[in-house]
Amino acid sequence: MIKINEHFLKLQSSYLFSEIAKRVNAHQATHPDQSIIKLGIGDATQPLCPACLDAFHKAVDEMGTASSFRGYGPEQGYAFLREAVAANDYQARGADIQPDEVFISDGAKCDTGNFQELFATDIRVAIPDPVYPVYLDTNVMAGRTGAFENGRYGNIVYMECTAQNSFLPAIPKEPADLVYLCFPNNPTGAVATKEYLQAWVDWALDAKALILFDAAYEAFIRDPSIPKTIYEIPGARKVAVEFRSFSKTAGFTGTRCAFSVVPKECMAYDTSGKAHALHALWNRRHCTKFNGVSYPVQRAAEAVYSPEGKAQAKEMIRTYMANADRITAAMAGMGFSYVGGDHSPYIWVDTKTDSWAFFDTLLTKAGVVCTPGGGFGKCGAQYIRLSAFNSYANVDAAMKRMAEVFGKA
């Protein structure tokens, strides 16, 4: 008799964004004439940068002739892209990251979800609340949690992020082996200072713990004093793995390209206490389960680092941040408290009511889709996340609709 992994049964019935889509589709079926403006899921809406598109076309043409055709590529990524990532995203900021420490993949979601496979099932995991659901759900699937009761799983260290601590998770007082951090944060939009991250690195060094650092939204940081990578922090190479994506920085949500950075001195330990390099373990896992990102996509990603690509990507970010500015101004005008939107495409809005109820009200009365904060954890129960990923015209229209429903302060 074939048996299932019963840990899957502990998962909540529906992935957050699937539930949102279900409710939106049901509403549209009964209100076909109402236009819907989606400020929910963080999907890019601007087209690929022209520099990326040109490189993409050229690489596709190369695949059409025998002399330049490419078959299977290196699982870890082509050297040209790994070198561009290391030089531009890390070495240019004084971070000592080498090309062979960069692993190209098809998404940060996949990497953040898969990296936990390297660790024992009896480790203690610390996760922020609210949190991007993938961090938690993949550890549930792996069997690291207890049952789901009163809105939380057993055996997880929940780090509450509230207005009282500026939505910055505090170092846990109880033991933890694996910690997930995301800055600029999804969903709250909060950012971390160098001093704050240094405290985390120092803690991890002392505890022999590991930080999984999601920096997918670093391109939205507008203050040069805010770190864009955890490797700007002394000691981080020993205790942190970083994940990034081209999805939001260059519009690759439908094209799929990202990368993880695993420094060679970053260690984890066996039951005898012997240290093992995570770089070697991740390389083994990566080569076993992944066949690499396609050559044309990697050439398109490489073009992000060209002078033209950098300028075009910055303009794309500027467009989204203009949307964020419009949203934050509207929230202030309507009297809502919020965080984010200054260095992030996400705005975390305090609704003072149940987030799913607010979602339904916003959808039915204004035709605007948000993301209910309750889907990110108990601490998000009265918040919604608004996304700046749309056209300015749509964002402006959505804010006007919201003002009609909720009024102006």
Curated annotation (Swiss-Prot):
Keywords: Aminotransferase, Pyridoxal phosphate, Transferase
Coiled-coil positions: none
Pathway in which the depicted protein is active: Amino-acid biosynthesis; L-lysine biosynthesis via DAP pathway; LL-2,6-diaminopimelate from (S)-tetrahydrodipicolinate (aminotransferase route): step 1/1
Assembly notes: Homodimer.
Function (record text): Involved in the synthesis of meso-diaminopimelate (m-DAP or DL-DAP), required for both lysine and peptidoglycan biosynthesis. Catalyzes the direct conversion of tetrahydrodipicolinate to LL-diaminopimelate.
Family of this protein: Belongs to the class-I pyridoxal-phosphate-dependent aminotransferase family. LL-diaminopimelate aminotransferase subfamily.
Protein's recorded name: LL-diaminopimelate aminotransferase
Organism: Desulfosudis oleivorans (strain DSM 6200 / JCM 39069 / Hxd3) (Desulfococcus oleovorans)
Gene this protein is translated from: dapL
